[in-house]
């Protein structure tokens, strides 16, 4: 065995002496922790630690400091942009899997909050809450872990009404690289006390500390929910209609766009018979039947004035479930439509009034570059994704497309990422987006993680 390999074997043995069977070197486990949802290659870590509690997290970090081995926190594995993989292939790296830390520690219905461990998924949390009349609203589509959602500042289909993770996390417990445990935030709706370190850690992608406890805000389950499915002659007209809805001040709960290619893939994948035209999925939540019927009526009038071809209203839970299944399955429907391809997902955000312009630009460069891509997203908050299918050897062209779209978004006062994070794939745009502030981000990283042990090579 080469000396380096022998040193690593001895090191892992010392880790196992502390954590025992919680440490895995199984090839299948390593492979599962060396990928995310869309990074084009697998980069396995040297070992995976399945932490059961804060003591395990601290013990793992102590070993990492002693051995000078970096660590990547891992939740449900639904991350994007290479956030979960080592910064380079073959780099010695440990994966800290938090999925066993999945308890609901406390629910306070009277205060509309719950305290959870990081490994619980949003679906599991809402199952635990089903008898309280409350729910956790942040819905990124994937059944992500709450800790991972906090680490990426996740958002999704309901953000337009309920906000993303920063708006729905009241407090955090984090373990720093030096093993110190910090408790950030208080279980209150607002505070003006001190610097907001809680929000600094939300969206930090495990580069500043390991999240070990999350206090989340809960919301009443809406008594009445109606959903509209609205088809348009073109995707730009659909985007313009979405802006009209937002400008009307109607209390929309979800406002999602799926283009013609996305609808076609849904029809084939799920056996639906939707008209193969660009579509808006619009949802309203209300406490009274009369109010929601008024909202739906006004929305339908707005849509028809904006050029809608057809408006279908889903009033039953079965109809709504089928409709949102279609929206959430677009990615897998496209994978099914283009088998054997590599998939790149963009994540730009622009001010609401600029969404139609960026949608039109996206269509233009897809055509110019001769690429297959579907435009899907949360246009109610200015965020949409382009799902691009290319042969593996064309991955560089897909990244070129992504770069052109990011730079156009920045020109329109937007951002390179609304919810997926920077990871490995968008670091090149950080200076362009943040200017001199990027150096202060580097200083913060050095302050919290002076040895660069926590998810190195990401964001900065």
Model-derived regions, located:
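N-terminal flexible segment immediately upstream of the FAD-binding catalytic core
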Residues: 2-62, 79-112, 262-270, 317-345, ...
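Activity-critical C-terminal alpha-helical subdomain
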Residues: 180, 427-460
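Alpha-helix capping/hinge segments and adjacent helical runs
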Residues: 21, 410-422, 435, 450-454
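C-terminal substrate-recognition/cap domain of FAD-linked oxidoreductases
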Residues: 25-33, 220, 226, 230-404, ...
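FAD-binding subdomain of flavoenzyme oxidoreductases
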Residues: 103-256, 453-455
